[in-house]
Amino acid sequence: MNVHMYENTATQKNLDICKSYHIKIVEPEIGELACGYQGRGHLSDIEDLLDAIEYATSPHPLAGKHVLITAGPTQEALDPVRYITNHSSGKMGYALAKVARQLGAHVTLISGPSSQRAPYEVDVIKIQSAQGMFKQVLSYFDFQDYVIMSAAVGDYRPLEYSNQKIKKKA
């Protein structure tokens, strides 16, 4: 779809009418369009489309529930270049978030660095360190019906952070 077609008043009014009937709209993404323009109108990611279809055709036993999930590794900085971490990919936490969303829950995913694709309609909060994860979990914890702690949080952090790259000692 062309960005100008999508932004047209008639198109927007028709989308609003559909939404007023609780019809789920998978919005187009922002990107390069076939006409050469940049803007909203690019076909949504196929995974998002499939997730929306699966959600629309699934039962929702967790509807109205809030689920907090942690995922991925944490990184503890030693200096501006190096950090301590582990090999966690975050796959399990992201998969749990996707399933909880498909079951109708409002899902908040607090994730360390991960290359996993954010699940459709899941609120993702990116963090780096164990302290960052701790603070985010505490800020959301009291509002959750379920909490799943699947992150691979680091066991250690340095006593001191060096503002400059630590030199090798021969």
Question: Could you describe each region identified by the protein language model?
Answer:
Residues 1-30, 40-53:
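Short, glycine-/small-residue-rich phosphate/pyrophosphate-handling segment
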Residues 4-8, 78-85, 156-170:
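Glycine/threonine-rich flexible loop motifs
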Residues 4-6, 33-37, 78-79, 118:
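A short acidic, helix-capping loop that chelates divalent metal ions and anchors anionic groups
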Residues 12, 16, 61-129:
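Glycine-rich phosphate/diphosphate-binding loop of Rossmann-like nucleotide-binding domains
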Residues 25-28, 109-111, 149-150:
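General beta-strand structural signal in soluble alpha/beta enzymes
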Residues 31, 72-76, 151-158:
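Short glycine-rich anion-binding loops that position phosphate/pyrophosphate groups of nucleotides
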Residues 50-63:
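Flexible nucleotide-interacting loop at or near the entrance of a catalytic core
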Residues 113, 121-170:
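A glycine- and small/hydrophobic-rich beta-loop-beta segment
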